[in-house]
């Protein structure tokens, strides 16, 4: 699907679920960002190869580069949430985000591996499958740009 087609799947209910869960997840960008990344690495060890510049990711919060990447990731998600009501702007920021991943030869399928860790981080904050499915639809917008 095109990026616009994927963005069209973000219905009013999906946007509400994204915003409601983001209020909690986004309130601790550093902690939840590091949790997201360390869960990605634990569940999909092959993804560590894309992040060699981060050094020893097993250090978690003690790794400055991992913390920096995690915080940057969370602000990208904040940007996506902020643009949910304007599909043109959402596509613009998603495509900018996608460039960083295309440069590193990260495919749509590889990028989709983030859905499992997102589901786990959401579950740790008592957000169930409905919310994980909403985030998967947002991830699909990024995947369409890759």
From Swiss-Prot:
Keywords: Cytoplasm, Heme, Iron, Metal-binding, Oxygen transport, Transport. It comes from the Eukaryota. GO terms for cellular component: cytoplasm. The keyword Metal-binding applies. GO terms for molecular function: heme binding; identical protein binding; metal ion binding; oxygen binding; oxygen carrier activity. It is found in: Cytoplasm. Pfam families: Globin (PF00042). Signal peptide: none annotated. Residues 9-146 form the Globin domain. Its main location: cytoplasm. Gene3D superfamilies: Globins. Heme b binds at residue 101. Belongs to the globin family. Homodimer. This is Globin-1. It comes from Anadara inaequivalvis.
